[in-house]
């Protein structure tokens, strides 16, 4: 196996790591700019234009639904010939969408420009980046590589969020949206320079592949696996897809309602933001460890991360009783957040190999998009119904316990893809 290292014997950085860096930059600036940084804009935009928070937030649902439709159409075209073209096109469209946001004078402009933003989100960010990293790393290094890529994404997001907060505070929310467009330009430069479909395009062997003595095979590693038509007919595939959706229902709810939950519990907005930033930084350090666990025993990483994520929502529920529950929330969120973006793509590779990964990852991210479209809005509706966050977070806990059971079922040894048997 080509060793898990950053430089070759000549001291040059392996090209695989430029792929990881590119994925981190693209998702850190673009994915996070579209989804994770929305909180920085919400109050400035709604107060300046006199919009309700609910009406303004609807653009996120429009964006998510557009991204789902986009993935249905383009996932089958994410291949060696088209992936770079798709990412560049999506980046240009994303720049246009944020320029439109910066010029918005009414609610409908946000709704209109949310459509091209959804195309950018689907065709440039998580799906193609996960696919590229998956292509460039073999089964013995894939989990660590994805976790390092996501750790880099988180660090870049923290930088982006602080820059946006400063720009919005000093200038305006319009300048903030233009800053996101600038970040997309930076991401595009990385795509143009570094994106290659697989190590075969560079004539090199990828990190993490077994040696010939470990696994003799006639086909290259990136071509081994179950046909998509067979994989999609298996019930376990749909169980996994539903688990991806439920995990993101909870994740998107935490993203939008985690800080408000802490504020309602008695934290100041500044304290709640500081807690969130601190957790994100610690998660950067924990992510590679979770990836290491998944490389060695995916069932342990998948089940434990999902269960910890469930316990984090219990902590959020208990904040209505005691502020000290923030410790429970924080500890288990750090250990559990990997269940969304680290574990989800590994499940399909574990069960079916890599031949159908472009389309399977497309389906994974379609279901992630469905969860993202309705998670935050659903929890907000439950909050209005019950008058507090306690019961809504317990409902999220129940959903994550289902995720835990599905991941235990799908990572059983008998479901692991074996090229000699399959």
Residue positions per predicted region:
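Helix-to-loop junctions at the C-terminal end of transmembrane segments
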Residues: 70-82, 287-298, 383-384
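Conserved MFS/SLC helix-loop-helix module at the cytosolic interface between two early adjacent transmembrane helices
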Residues: 69-107
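Extracytoplasmic gate region of multi-pass secondary transporters
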Residues: 34-45, 229-288
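Extracytoplasmic
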Residues: 18-53, 71, 161, 254-259
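Intracellular juxtamembrane helix-capping segments at the cytosolic ends
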Residues: 123-137, 339-352
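A late C-terminal transmembrane helix in Major Facilitator Superfamily
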Residues: 148, 157, 351-386
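C-terminal transmembrane helical hairpin of 12-TM major facilitator-type secondary transporters
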Residues: 277-287, 296-347
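Hydrophobic core of transmembrane alpha-helices in multi-pass small-molecule transporters
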Residues: 28, 109-124, 325-339
């Amino acid at each position: 196996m080509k060793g898990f290292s950053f430089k070759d014997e000549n001291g040059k950085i392996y090209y695989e790591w430029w792929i990881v860096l590119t994925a981190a930059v693209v998702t850190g600036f673009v994915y996070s700019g579209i989804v994770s940084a929305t909180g920085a804009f919400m109050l400035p935009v709604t107060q300046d234009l006199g919009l309700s928070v609910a009406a303004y937030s609807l653009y996120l649902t429009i964006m998510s639904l557009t991204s789902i439709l986009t993935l249905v159409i383009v996932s089958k075209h994410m291949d060696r010939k088209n992936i770079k073209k798709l990412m560049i096109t999506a980046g240009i469209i994303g720049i246009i969408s944020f320029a439109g946001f910066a010029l918005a004078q009414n609610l409908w402009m946000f709704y209109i420009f949310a459509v091209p933003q959804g195309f950018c989100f689907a065709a440039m960010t998580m799906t193609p980046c996960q696919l590229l990293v998956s292509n460039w790393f073999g089964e013995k290094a894939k989990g660590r590589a994805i976790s390092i890529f996501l750790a880099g994404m988180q660090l870049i997001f923290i930088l982006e969020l602080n820059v946006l907060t400063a720009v919005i505070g000093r200038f305006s929310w319009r300048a903030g949206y233009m800053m996101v467009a600038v970040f997309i330009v930076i991401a595009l430069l990385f795509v143009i320079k570094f994106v290659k479909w697989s190590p075969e395009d560079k004539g090199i062997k990828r990190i993490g592949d077994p040696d010939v003595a470990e696994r003799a095979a006639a086909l290259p590693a990136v071509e081994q696996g179950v046909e998509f038509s067979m994989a999609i007919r298996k019930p376990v595939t749909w169980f996994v897809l539903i688990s991806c959706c439920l995990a993101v229902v909870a994740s998107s709810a935490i993203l939008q309602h985690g800080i408000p939950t802490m504020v309602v519990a008695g934290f100041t907005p500044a304290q709640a933001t500081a807690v969130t930033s601190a957790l994100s930084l610690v998660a950067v350090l924990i992510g590679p460890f979770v990836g290491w666990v998944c490389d060695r025993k995916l069932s342990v990483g998948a089940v434990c991360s999902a269960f910890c994520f469930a316990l984090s929502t219990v902590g959020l529920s208990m904040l209505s009783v005691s502020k000290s529950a923030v410790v429970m929330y924080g500890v288990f969120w750090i250990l559990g957040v990997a269940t969304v973006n680290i574990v989800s793509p590994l499940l399909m590779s574990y069960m079916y190999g890599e031949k159908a990964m472009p389309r399977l990852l497309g389906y994974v991210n379609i279901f992630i998009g469905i969860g993202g479209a309705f998670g935050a809005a659903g929890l907000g509706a439950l909050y209005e119904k019950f008058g507090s966050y306690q019961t809504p977070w317990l409902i999220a806990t129940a959903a994550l316990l289902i995720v835990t059971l599905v991941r235990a079922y799908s990572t059983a040894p008998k479901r692991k893809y074996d090229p000699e048997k399959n």
